[in-house]
């Protein structure tokens, strides 16, 4: 199965994206939840046999250290707090840097309008799909579901993995199900899967149907269920 997915600009970009979903001050986010989501994302990339850059793995090891320190006795609480504080300061600094970069890019676009030479078009692979949800938003939500499914399948020793699931067949199956039910939760489909390969194939099929506007997606909250609809609301 050949899969290509645009990555974030770096581990801090991914962390900033995760933190921003909470809509609170950076220093008030539940850091353990953010760490879990980051690790779920990295593990899902590995399961899907996608390349993970070294800086992402380095950050993952640092996050696991912060998480493990939380399990230690309170006598080392100051060490834990120092690590978390350092991480949050880096995210905040990156957030300011990104805001400045975006402002400069906007100014550049405005200046380009004064020249007769057409400016070079920028192409963003992480395109907005529907309801302001991007490919990466769905992938991050999927990685959290994937983590839960891996935990279930890990205890099932009778499952035999197969790798002959066809995306086209999965797309047809989802469309057929929507003809009957009109609305389905993506997690409900995953719960019926017997292997991780089947889960991955269904996710990719869903993503393709969404991109083609054959089905429509919604997520009522940043951490809510992903809903597939036959018709747009």
Curated annotation (Swiss-Prot):
It is found in: Cytoplasm. It holds the Pfam family SMC_ScpA. Keywords: Cell cycle, Cell division, Chromosome partition, Cytoplasm. Its main location: cytoplasm. InterPro entries: ScpA (IPR003768). One of its GO terms (cellular component) is cytoplasm. Belongs to the ScpA family. HAMAP family: ScpA. Component of a cohesin-like complex composed of ScpA, ScpB and the Smc homodimer, in which ScpA and ScpB bind to the head domain of Smc. The presence of the three proteins is required for the association of the complex with DNA. NCBIfam families: PRK00104.1-2. This is Segregation and condensation protein A. The lineage of its organism: Bacteria, Bacillati, Bacillota, Bacilli, Lactobacillales.
């Amino acid at each position: 199965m050949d899969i290509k997915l645009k990555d974030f600009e770096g581990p801090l970009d991914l962390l900033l994206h995760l933190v921003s979903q909470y809509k609170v001050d950076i220093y008030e986010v539940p850091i353990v939840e953010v760490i879990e989501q980051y690790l779920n994302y990295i593990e899902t990339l590995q399961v899907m046999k996608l390349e993970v850059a070294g800086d992402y793995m380095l950050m993952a090891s640092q996050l696991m250290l912060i998480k493990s320190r939380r399990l230690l006795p309170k006598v080392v609480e100051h060490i834990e707090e120092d690590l978390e504080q350092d991480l949050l300061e880096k995210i905040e600094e990156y957030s300011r840097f990104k805001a400045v970069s975006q402002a400069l890019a906007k100014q550049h676009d405005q200046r380009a309008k004064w020249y007769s030479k057409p400016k070079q078009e920028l192409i963003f692979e992480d395109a907005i799909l529907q309801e302001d949800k991007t490919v990466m938003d769905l992938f991050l939500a999927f990685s959290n579901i994937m983590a839960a499914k891996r935990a279930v399948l890990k205890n099932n020793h009778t499952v035999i993995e197969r790798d002959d699931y066809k995306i086209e067949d999965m797309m047809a199956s989802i469309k057929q199900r929507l003809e009957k039910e009109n609305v389905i939760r993506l997690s409900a489909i995953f719960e019926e899967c017997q292997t991780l390969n089947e889960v991955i194939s269904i996710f990719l099929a869903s993503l393709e149907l969404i991109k083609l506007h054959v089905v429509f997606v919604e997520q009522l909250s940043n951490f809510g269920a992903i809903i597939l609809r036959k018709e747009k609301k």
